[in-house]
């Protein structure tokens, strides 16, 4: 298991991902799951916007989140320390996964994606990222990367609100990034199928 402590320390207190900020500017939800919450920046942002959040991470640092919340805001947060491979997901209106689920064991990714789908209520939302197949990490066997066609296949039971392909080289370490920003609304199931 990779130790995420350094990453969490490095990203603690960063601004929330623009994707969740943009989403919450347009859509209202009352509950969310932040899957792979890391240092909790998006979790804190959602709670501060009045959303009840279940924060899940395999290496959960609750203090990183709780230290940034008022006593009343702390009533909106719950935690679950679990790996992607073992996680159980309750029903929710919004499931977020910011640069997290590509780190699921590749042998378990399809199962995780099914759990995510089953967790999201009809007309609920998935907001997050998947790594593209031209990302520098595409050669790392333990990391999931996807072609645009594969991403669209994963989203076939969703109405795609945003699917933006982003590709650049980060100057600080010359790492090639290729990922997809996703906002998708789960289609209503036809009970007669």
Label the model's feature ranges.
Residues 1-28, 38-88, 107-111, 125-193:
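Class I (Rossmann-like) S-adenosyl-L-methionine-dependent methyltransferase catalytic domain
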Residues 30, 93:
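Conserved acidic residues
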Residues 35:
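Conserved beta-strand/loop positions that form the S-adenosyl-L-methionine
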Residues 96:
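A conserved beta-strand element that flanks and buttresses the S-adenosyl-L-methionine
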Residues 99-100:
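Short catalytic micro-motifs in class I SAM-dependent methyltransferases
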Residues 103:
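ABC ATPase nucleotide-binding domain "signature" loop
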Residues 110-122:
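A short glycine-rich, Lys/Arg-flanked "PGG" loop and its adjoining helix->strand segment in the class I
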């Amino acid at each position: 298991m990779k130790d995420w402590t350094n990453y969490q320390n490095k990203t603690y207190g960063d601004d929330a991902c623009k994707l969740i900020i943009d989403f919450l500017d347009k859509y209202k939800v009352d509950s969310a799951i932040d899957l792979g919450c890391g240092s909790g920046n998006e979790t804190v942002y959602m709670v501060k916007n009045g959303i009840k959040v279940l924060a899940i991470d395999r290496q959960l640092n609750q203090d990183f989140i709780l230290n940034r919340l008022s006593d009343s805001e702390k009533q909106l947060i719950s935690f679950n320390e679990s790996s992607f491979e073992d996680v159980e997901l309750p029903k929710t209106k919004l499931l977020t996964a910011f640069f997290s689920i590509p780190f699921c064991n590749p042998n378990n990714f399809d199962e995780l994606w099914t759990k995510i789908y089953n967790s999201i209520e009809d007309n609920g939302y998935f907001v997050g990222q998947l790594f593209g197949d031209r990302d520098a990490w595409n050669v790392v066997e333990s990391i999931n990367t996807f072609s645009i066609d594969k991403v669209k296949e994963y989203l076939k039971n969703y109405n795609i609100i945003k699917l933006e392909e982003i590709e650049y080289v980060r100057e600080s370490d010359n790492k090639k990034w290729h990922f997809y920003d996703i906002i998708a609304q789960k289609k209503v199931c036809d009970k007669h199928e």
